Amino acid sequence: MLYPTEFDVIVVGGGHAGTEAALASARMGAKTLLLTHNIETLGQMSCNPSIGGIGKGHLVKEVDALGGAMAAATDEAGIQFRILNSSKGPAVRATRAQADRILYKAAIRRRLENQPNLWLFQQAVDDLMVEGDCVVGAVTQIGIRFRARAVVLTAGTFLDGKIHVGLNNYTGGRAGDPAAVSLSARLKELKLPQGRLKTGTPPRIDGRTIDFSKLEEQPGDLDPIPVFSFLGRAEQHPQQLPCWVTHTNERTHDIIRGGLDRSPMYTGVIEGVGPRYCPSIEDKIHRFASKESHQIFLEPEGLTTNEFYPNGISTSLPFDVQLELVHSMRGLEQAHILRPGYAIEYDYFDPRALKASLETKAINGLFFAGQINGTTGYEEAAAQGLLAGVNAGRYVQEKDAWCPRRDQAYLGVLVDDLVTRGVAEPYRMFTSRAEYRLSLREDNADMRLTEIGRELGLVDDVRWDAFCRKRDAVSRETERLKTTWVTPKTLPPEEATALLGKPIDHEYSLAELLRRPGVDYDGVCGLKGGECGPAEPLADDPVLLAQIKEQVEIGIKYQGYIERQATEIERNDANENTRLPDGIDYREVRGLSFEVSQKLNQFRPETIGQASRISGVTPAAISLLMVHLKRRGLGRRNGAAAPAAEQGDGAVPTQQ
């Protein structure tokens, strides 16, 4: 039957990508339908019970700055919070949280059920409705046809998923859930380029059978307890719990080696490529044969369960081998396994067949987000989901897509890497992937993106008001520190010595003092008995106050580096966003090698910047391409055709 209501946007899948996509398009005013095979699993953490980490935490902060749900849900569900790399520079500091699975899922579902313009429906999707080169809806397992002008597909590991435990395997999207076999077959009919990838998960352990007296305790940060959302408060966190650490040993490694003849990875049963940066335990033992031990983190799954997640022993070995290797580790000698570990193979589609908006090049109105694009991780999925939801909403509103740049957001780095370079293995985010990471810090994600989010319709009044207060306070306080001066006469020598190691010998601004190594904001403001501090409190709220002080201190201390990076960005921007015509035939570009013209015709980059990052496309080739465009007057700056109503102060960067 044809469902009587027509929607603007349909989102297929209720994982981390799907939920953010549905919430984003609905916040923008698009009439949105979220189709999921099971409403009870919306927002489910299918693998590890944690959010964030190096690079990943940056993505979560960006999703939050754009009004997304992941950070806020983590603040409500997080049972341990830590700042990683806290002793290093601000560019690589990252927030990570252990989350209670049940509380997290409940927090996400509550937001979905209370979001205006969003409807939920429980049915697996078997088919897409395509007319010509446009998607027009989706068909469910029982034949219900839903019409919409845009569809966002976030199928996770469900597309033709196959689960492996030893040499036994069966179809499934994850343990306990069916695979999307029909939908996968339909996508293959559409001639979209695809491949197979693999990921895995460890056996889960009953905490009542763990001997914690033999383990090393790993508490979270308690003074202060971090928060994830820019609007988060530590008071939102539930009870905090420690993690625990054990190690593999030589006996563990011998057990694993002895089971490799029954490993689906090492017997050729699994064809998909696994994640390099989250390898299975058998892969670790094989690749790092000289290493005598590997650290294993025992992470609590929640406050109302005894289940523990042993982070570091993802495996698809037979269950008898899993049992033996778990029992070989200190503290786990009597451990009871609640669920076996397994590997899952699934279809993904080459992201080079996508535009930077995450819309497919072949089918108008069809967007992909999450693991279907070859990524791994909740955070990467959520970020893509939000972007796909935004651009699906703008597509039906007949507005240009929003495509964040590499110098603007980790989300821009993520998508640009995917659509220009593709993936040979599951892609995960690291700070090292961002060439402008000093400007793309966790602490300034809101400064970079919240104004854009407001313009897009993603940011509500509460977030906007908090952001404006923070932005204005940072600006005022930075200016005050730059224009407040102390001299050898006005600054007592003993105070200068206590803070700086010696008295000052000439006039300094407070900002100049703050730039010195080992000097912090509070130290500078405490000079002259506190007279060097602001006349009025920067904020009444302690969390907001801490954010303001952090922004001011980083902005002043790293001003020179940040300005140099801004100059580099401006220099590179000259050609980065020059658009390439849709119908250009690169064989006609004089001087291009056959290999380069073939690659450009195959991958169809949208901008000069994207073309320059395709493997094998040299700087010389880019120069030839620029000459070709100038001769024919074909190139135009990104966003040049944006409607006049969308230009001006705070205008959203656009891309067709």
UniProtKB/Swiss-Prot annotation:
Gene from which this protein is expressed: mnmG
Protein name: tRNA uridine 5-carboxymethylaminomethyl modification enzyme MnmG
Keyword list, A-Z: Cytoplasm, FAD, Flavoprotein, NAD, tRNA processing
Requisite cofactors: FAD
Repressor in keyword set: no
Its biological purpose: NAD-binding protein involved in the addition of a carboxymethylaminomethyl (cmnm) group at the wobble position (U34) of certain tRNAs, forming tRNA-cmnm(5)s(2)U34.
Superkingdom of source: Bacteria
Subunit note: Homodimer. Heterotetramer of two MnmE and two MnmG subunits.
Species per Swiss-Prot/TrEMBL record: Burkholderia multivorans (strain ATCC 17616 / 249)
